[in-house]
Amino acid sequence: MPSGFNAKSFLKNVTSAPGVYRMYDKHQQVIYVGKAKDLKKRLSSYFRVNIANVKTQALVSHIDHIDVTVTHSETDALLLENDYIKQYMPKYNVLLRDDKSYPYILLSGHKHPRLAYHRGPKREKGHYFGPYPNGGAVRESLHLIQKLFPIRQCDDLYYKSRSRPCLQYQLDRCSAPCVGIVSDDEYSEQVKLAGLFLRGKDKQVISQLVAKMETAAIDMEYERAAQYRDQITALRRVAEQQEVSNHKGDMDVIGVDYASGIACFHLLFIRDGKIFGSRSYYPSVPAETEIEEVLSSFLGQFYLNADIQRTIPKEVILSHHFDGITELQASIEHALDKKFELKTQVRGDRANFLRLAMTNASNAVATKLSHKNTVEQRFQLLEEALELNEPIKRMECFDISHTMGESTVASCVVFNREGPHKADYRRYNITGITGGDDYAAMEQAISRRFDKIDNNGKVPDLVFIDGGIGQLRVAQTIVDEKCVNIDHPPLLICVTKGEGRKAGLETFTVGGSEQTFEVASDSPAFHLMLHIRDESHRFAITGHRNKRQKTRNTSTLESIAGVGPKRRKALLQHLGGIQEVKGASVAELTKVPGISLEMAQTIHDALRGG
């Protein structure tokens, strides 16, 4: 324990009321947040003579001072603890790292509602279906629904500017309410059916469609009856693919596996008896943390997340029991003001779902451990190859991508000892340089990256430059200038492609000394350096292609006199893209708001070379 902190004196003044405590280190950083029913009793436990837990020993050794906040109840303490953990992200707390809001499908409240991907606050009027486990699940569902129900998915501006059906109508994926091809009643009918389908009422949807098909057949509307028949067939095919149980309610099923410092919470979202989706969480767990704390911390943070409170089911099945589960359940139930039950002893369908969740969690941890061991070995061998005295915690790699100097983009990718850390990836749009000047592009990218760096920031141990010695020199000059007050400035290494740009013939040069070094091409250290180089190249070229395409979509129109930003936007949105604009007749161009006959002729001639 640091001599600057007097635990005995501190504990004399601590109350026995419920509350939250924040532990700070000498740098005034919050390193741990905890809650207690009895603050004095809980805080005293940290300063006993014999502390067996290694994590607690490490925590106590770094305490500089402790702040205490008294609350009215244990529930209030739980809520405040959750807020503080999200605010400070303390290093000794179990942290739910993926705290993004869940994605939903929005069925808007317009006269002709649209289906859309939604993430974030629910401000727009309409019905929200979800939550879905990830964005991919939403997009997959939207793609499926588009095949089953011809409801628009375009944005409102595009919808309002249409004068003719778009491609989605030709593909039978939209009934074109924008131009009145479908009646309001027919469109509303499909919207209601889509809503029922999204609520999991497949049988009800099919039943209604069967009735409509039979009515259409009786009325000798055979084409309409055939449309209903095809819709029913597609729906039945989808329904057969979904796993269904005899349990018809909503619940979350959580399988937990914890080994070698890696914890996985695999969640199955059961809605109306079906597996609606699944998602794995890997909370950041400090070394030597007990499983009870991992469970309690995760559940508290997860179910008190404001983004998902309104969609929490009443029943949550958990693979592990732990001390304090009853109190945690009561606190969450009180905080949410709704019935909430944590169960660990289940049978039948619930047990089957739980076994599935546990299997997925176990497999996920095994995969993570295997990957972690492989990455760790690569880092250790790279440290040996570079003869480093300190372990590598963070590596970055920069690359430049352009086409003949057009749409230049720089990338910065980040690796830590778990592999690629994509949350820290960055792209830089390079401006104000001569096209094709890779040195100036690298200078701008490195300058922007290191502009605000300090000892408390994310200082890389290694920086790789994908390029030649000239780019390395530019980067080294900038780093020397920007990192003058940094205790341990990064080591720069450039990766230069070999003869014929063949993989395995790369050369590596150290910044400053400009000495080259060799690593066997079959060495894991070599593979690690090429991995980060290739990832940087991939990230740069993807950004460059996106920027180039966006530029080319507008640059053709930019060259036409009289076509400013507003007219370009109107043309692209009204007609659906640059190719459609190029293929439009003069008459079609005049239907775009703001385009006169004379302007339409000018645009037509410019794009057709006439």
From Swiss-Prot:
Pfam families: GIY-YIG, HHH_5, UVR, UvrC_RNaseH, UvrC_RNaseH_dom. PANTHER family: UVRABC SYSTEM PROTEIN C (PTHR30562:SF1), UVRC/OXIDOREDUCTASE (PTHR30562). The gene is uvrC. One of its GO terms (biological process) is nucleotide-excision repair. Keywords: Cytoplasm, DNA damage, DNA excision, DNA repair, Excision nuclease, SOS response. Gene3D superfamilies: 5' to 3' exonuclease, C-terminal subdomain (1.10.150.20), GIY-YIG endonuclease (3.40.1440.10), UVR domain (4.10.860.10), UvrC, RNAse H endonuclease domain (3.30.420.340). InterPro entries: GIY-YIG_endonuc, GIY-YIG_endonuc_sf, GIY-YIG_UvrC_Cho, Hlx-hairpin-Hlx_DNA-bd_motif, RuvA_2-like, UVR_dom, UVR_dom_sf, UvrABC_protein_C. NCBIfam families: PRK00558.1-5, uvrC. This is UvrABC system protein C. Residues 203-238 form the UVR domain. Residues 16-94 form the GIY-YIG domain. PROSITE patterns: GIY_YIG, UVR, UVRC. It comes from Shewanella frigidimarina (strain NCIMB 400). The lineage of its organism: Bacteria, Pseudomonadati, Pseudomonadota, Gammaproteobacteria, Alteromonadales. The UvrABC repair system catalyzes the recognition and processing of DNA lesions. UvrC both incises the 5' and 3' sides of the lesion. The N-terminal half is responsible for the 3' incision and the C-terminal half is responsible for the 5' incision. One of its GO terms (cellular component) is excinuclease repair complex. Interacts with UvrB in an incision complex.
